[in-house]
């Protein structure tokens, strides 16, 4: 069986709003992605994690936090889309839940993701250009 590979990438970030902070420890992302990998492996999907701290973005709130998480899936021609582009608006502002939604959307319904460079305005309005 040919495995589908999905990579979760975390960029570095700088909090610029003293009134807001993430409600989860973003450093726990590697363990969470490992758990996702274990859940999806038997279905022919591998999920990997890469930390790219040198690519640093400003984070003012939750929508910006979605922008530091990038998903890649070469088999689906998804090069480096931000999480918000893939899931749209977050339902519960739960980062790990949103990452799971994004990964499973790529895994099982990549045709539902707006193509990179499309003219659609994404409702989370993170400013990433998608």
Can you annotate each of these PLM segments?
Residues 57-58:
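N-terminal non-catalytic structural scaffold regions of very large proteins
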């Amino acid at each position: 069986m040919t495995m589908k590979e999905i990579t979760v990438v975390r960029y570095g970030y700088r909090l610029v709003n003293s009134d807001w902070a993430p409600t989860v420890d973003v450093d726990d992302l590697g363990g969470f992605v490992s758990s996702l990998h274990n859940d999806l492996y038997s279905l022919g999907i591998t999920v990997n994690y890469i930390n790219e701290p040198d690519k640093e973005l400003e984070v003012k709130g939750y929508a910006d936090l979605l922008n530091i998480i990038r998903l890649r899936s070469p088999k689906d021609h998804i090069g480096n889309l931000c999480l918000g582009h893939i899931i749209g608006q977050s339902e519960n502002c739960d980062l790990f839940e949103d990452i799971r939604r994004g990964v499973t959307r790529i895994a099982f319904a990549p045709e539902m993701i707006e193509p990179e460079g499309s003219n659609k305005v994404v409702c989370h309005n993170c400013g990433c250009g998608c």
